[in-house]
Amino acid sequence: AQFVKRGYSQVEPNHLSAQRTGQIYAQLPAKSDIEVLENGQFVKYDYVNKEVNFTGKGEWMMVFNEVKTYRDRETYEDFAMIKQNYNARVYSPVGQSNSDLEHVMDYSKAAFREGSSEGFTWDIPKLSYPQNMADGTTMVPRVIKTNVGDIYTTNGVDETSLQEGDELAPNEKGFLNKASAASAGAGDMKWIVVKVYTLADNQPAVKLQRIA
């Protein structure tokens, strides 16, 4: 995104309805060829193909991961979801059938709670868990649905300059730009620039409102 001068795209949630409606999704892995996902980037939540990508059907969803930084000098600009930092591989906590797990885990022995002489054994039903994630997928982003009227501030726009009233829409890489808004069809997502100013770290940013 050209508005980003340092680090990665950021999001300041001024008024995002997903925080009230619960339209937050984090069950599908990013497609294997996606190396980086930045907050404020838009993706398709492609449930048919069991992946997050840029080409699926349906509405654009906004990437809005929890910012995790681990050094004192790091700020929001230093965070993005980078594939090499993640190693998820299964859709569930187990990822395989319990009959398979019996070969490596012994549930037959009694366990004892602290301070108790009465033992108990695990009653594990023979349930099959979902299959492993697709080859090459390792990260599962958190995405949110936006609605008309939503407002947020970001530098995740693929433009060098903007002014109030400019309309934006996601391009093929999920970043907002004017060209995509100009070619958008009826019913497609659109955002309008309501204010041009800066983020807390003094990088250029825009406040946006969804209008379609």
Task: Name the predicted role of every residue range.
Residues A1-A212:
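Surface-exposed, low-hydrophobicity beta-strand/loop segments enriched in small/polar/acidic residues
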